[in-house]
């Protein structure tokens, strides 16, 4: 889908100050390095300012301070990145869903599907499910018994919702995601693992986004819960009974063990792992590849990852780590010897 807007229209949509001709047509978005005369770009990160002078964009989203020295056209805003985020939806080429149920879809007789919803080819909607207004269900999706997909939801092709999953409004779920699969619950009886039925569900709030191939397991007894505004990247594992607070974001490959609770407005970088049955308070940032083994009770930034080094230096550091226990014991012995000598009373020059 091709979209064309004038600079004047974009300025009005953003409440921006326009520096340049209102009638100039903009047909898309691009980076400072790649933008052409009919495209809009933005400068948000200072490290990219070096590309601004030679930028060929039709216009650039800029802060007032950067616009003063820029010879080209500009839309002057307080926060260029937020402005870019808003404008991006106007130029999104994603095909629009068409209301109705595809002839190849299988919809249970007692399922409720709003007339404005779109059900794609070969989708399955099971008994008791409810699909609300303006929902788009992509091809080959499976919506299990008694599921609810809230108003304005968008399920990409091949999303799976097991039974008893409740999804809020305007939720986006990408392909391959599985919501409500059975949690990893087993009881060990004399070395034999006995399966525990996972009889809870999953409850997801409004404005949540879930990435490609991410799994959110159903609760063992009560629901696994994802709060409003949560953003989950690709290939994340959310185990049974986990609770995630509003507006928390997680990058790819995070793994959260069962019954862990994460607060609001937290950020977990890529590859973070959390053990089960711990609590993370609000406003916590955890850096990439960190292993969280205990509860975090104070807001702030946390890390356990080892920073990159040249290989030879890393090998030396790894060898020293193995020696730390022995070195600590030797240091304690030296401290005892020093204490013994000093406590015995040494002669002074004053005699």
Swiss-Prot record:
- Looking at its record, which EC class is this enzyme? transferase
Q: Which PROSITE patterns match?
A: HEXAPEP_TRANSFERASES (PS00101)
Q: Which GO terms describe its molecular function?
A: N-acyltransferase activity
Q: Which GO terms describe its cellular component?
A: membrane
Q: Name one GO biological process term.
A: lipid A biosynthetic process
Pathway given in the UniProt record = Bacterial outer membrane biogenesis; LPS lipid A biosynthesis
Where in the chain are disulfide-linked cysteines found? none
Q: Which UniProt keywords apply?
A: Acyltransferase, Lipid A biosynthesis, Lipid biosynthesis, Lipid metabolism, Repeat, Transferase
Q: What is its EC number?
A: 2.3.1.191
Any idea which residues are catalytic in this one?
Answer: 240
Reaction(s) catalysed by this chain, per the record, are: a UDP-3-O-[(3R)-3-hydroxyacyl]-alpha-D-glucosamine + a (3R)-hydroxyacyl-[ACP] = a UDP-2-N,3-O-bis[(3R)-3-hydroxyacyl]-alpha-D-glucosamine + holo-[ACP] + H(+)
Give the protein's biological function: Catalyzes the N-acylation of UDP-3-O-acylglucosamine using 3-hydroxyacyl-ACP as the acyl donor. Is involved in the biosynthesis of lipid A, a phosphorylated glycolipid that anchors the lipopolysaccharide to the outer membrane of the cell.
UniProt lists the family membership as follows:
Belongs to the transferase hexapeptide repeat family. LpxD subfamily.
PANTHER family to which the protein is assigned, alphabetical: UDP-3-O-ACYLGLUCOSAMINE N-ACYLTRANSFERASE, UDP-3-O-ACYLGLUCOSAMINE N-ACYLTRANSFERASE 1, MITOCHONDRIAL-RELATED
The record's note on quaternary structure and interaction partners says: Homotrimer.
What name goes with this protein? Answer: UDP-3-O-acylglucosamine N-acyltransferase
Write down the species: Pseudomonas putida (strain GB-1)
Gene from which the chain derives: lpxD
């Amino acid at each position: 889908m091709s979209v064309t807007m004038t600079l004047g229209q974009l300025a009005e949509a953003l409440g921006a100050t326009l520096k340049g001709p209102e009638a100039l047509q903009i047909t898309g978005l691009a980076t400072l390095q790649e933008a052409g005369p009919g495209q809009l770009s933005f400068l948000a990160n200072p490290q990219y300012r070096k590309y601004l002078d030679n930028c060929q964009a039709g216009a650039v989203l800029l802060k007032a301070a950067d616009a003063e020295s820029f010879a080209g056209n500009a839309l002057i805003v307080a926060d260029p990145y937020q402005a870019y985020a808003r404008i991006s939806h106007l130029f999104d080429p994603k095909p629009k869903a068409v209301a109705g149920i595809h002839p190849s879809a299988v919809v249970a007789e007692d399922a409720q599907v709003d007339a404005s919803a779109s059900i794609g080819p070969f989708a399955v909607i099971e008994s008791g499910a409810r699909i609300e207004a303006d929902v788009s269900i992509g091809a080959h999706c499976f919506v299990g018994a008694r599921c609810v997909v809230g108003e304005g939801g968008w399920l990409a092709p091949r999303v799976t919702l097991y039974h008893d999953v409740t999804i809020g409004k305007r939720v986006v779920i990408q392909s391959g995601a599985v919501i409500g699969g059975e949690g990893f619950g087993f009881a060990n009886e004399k070395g034999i693992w006995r399966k525990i039925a996972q009889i809870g569900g999953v409850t997801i709030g409004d404005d949540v986004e879930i990435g490609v191939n991410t799994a959110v397991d159903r609760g063992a007894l009560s629901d696994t819960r994802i709060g409003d505004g949560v953003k989950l990247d690709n290939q994340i594992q959310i185990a049974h009974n986990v609770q995630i607070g509003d507006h928390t974001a997680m990058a790819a490959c995070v793994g959260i063990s069962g019954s862990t609770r994460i607060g609001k407005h937290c950020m977990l970088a890529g590859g973070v792992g959390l053990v089960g049955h711990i609590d993370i308070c609000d406003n916590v940032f955890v850096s990439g590849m960190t292993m969280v083994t205990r509860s975090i009770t104070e807001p702030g930034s946390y890390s356990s990852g080892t920073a990159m080094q040249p290989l030879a230096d890393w090998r030396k550091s790894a060898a020293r780590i193995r020696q730390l226990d022995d070195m600590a014991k030797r240091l304690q012995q030296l401290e005892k010897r020093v204490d013994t000598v000093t406590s015995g009373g040494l002669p002074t020059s004053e005699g």
